[in-house]
Each structure stands twice: as C-alpha cells, then as structure tokens.
Amino acid sequence: MDKKITGLKLFLLLFWQVSFAQQTILTDSNLPIMVISTDIDPATNSPIDIPDEPKVLATMQLIFRPDGARNYLTDITNDSFLNYNGRMGIELRGSSSQELDKKPYGFTTLLEDNDSNNNVSLLGMPSENDWVLNSLAYDPSMIRDYLSYTLASNMGNYAPRVKYIEVIVNDDYKGVYILTEKIKRDSDRVNLKKIDDEDTDFPEVTGGVHH
C-alpha cells in the first residue's frame, strides 16, 4: 500500500513539473500584445471569469510600437506604445471551440461610462467597436483564416481585416490569435444600405430575400 502511495505521489509530482514547465510566460514579442484584465468580482475578490454571454466588463491595453520594433510587456505603462488603453465588454464566442483550452472571444470597445460604444482604430484597421479574437484553435498552422481572408481581400472582395497578436487574459498567456473585424453592416465593413420597411421589391431588395 505504501509503495502505491509513493508511486502516486511521484506521478503527481512529475505531472505537476511537466505542466508547470509547459506554461509560457510572455515578456516580449514581435507581434502586438493584447492584455485583458476583467473587473474584480466583489463576492470573490478575484477577476470575473469570461462567460459565453453576456459580456463582462474589462480593461484592455494593446501594446504596439508604431515603428515596428519588438513589443515588451513592460511597455504597458508607456502611453507612447499603447495602441489602445481603455474599457471593453468581452464574452466567449463560438460553439464547440468554447470547450477547448484556447478559447475564442468577442468584444466591444467601450467608453469610460462602461455602456457607450467606443469606435476606435485598432492596429490601423478602420474605426469600429465590434471585434473578434479568433483563437485558431482548429488550425495548428495558424495561417488558414489569415490567408483566406487576405487573399479574398486582395482579389477585390470584402473580407474581414486581420492582424496577428499575442493575448494575455488576467495574467494568463493564451497564445497567438488573430484580431479580426466582426462581420457587420458598416461603411468600412459590409457596405450595405439599411433596408427600410417600404423596400420590398427590386432593385432595393435582390438576391432571393423573402418576406
């Protein structure tokens, strides 16, 4: 019995050491670094977990040296290297991908009142408030979505603009994501006119739309 207990202790110790060794602590990167800190839950005095919905409030800093130099986590206190430093609402997105360790997120940039949308340009993309953090969890190469969106855009079709970034959530390094424009009607995204109630026939309505 003692040998079994000793063997179990040894296994747990080795498992803990391997797991600890596999944890990555990000200090710098040639990619922009997004740091997300959810608000503190007064009931637990700990950061709020990010749910499927609704969005929870958080603060986000996006570290990006405009000259293209390497980005450092210590730059988080230097306004000159912060592409964004403000409030956000964030939630999980996706379906089966939510079950993976590396989860996808959707977020809205907010004004300081924690309610009003804040249209901002992130990493040179047109100003908006709805964004996606694509975890690339089902694509080990981490290039499929980036390549398909970029090729479609270069061919003259609309496709979401994308930027590779590093993501840290509540001091936990999550890995490489692509910051992506959320697909929506907008002059800089899907540039479609809003349909009015009286728009029921061609040419206002096309493409097999039924009422």
Question: Where do the model's predicted regions map?
Answer:
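Bacterial Sec-dependent N-terminal signal peptides
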Residues: 1-23
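Phosphate/dinucleotide-binding and metal-coordinating scaffold of catalytic cores
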Residues: 22-211
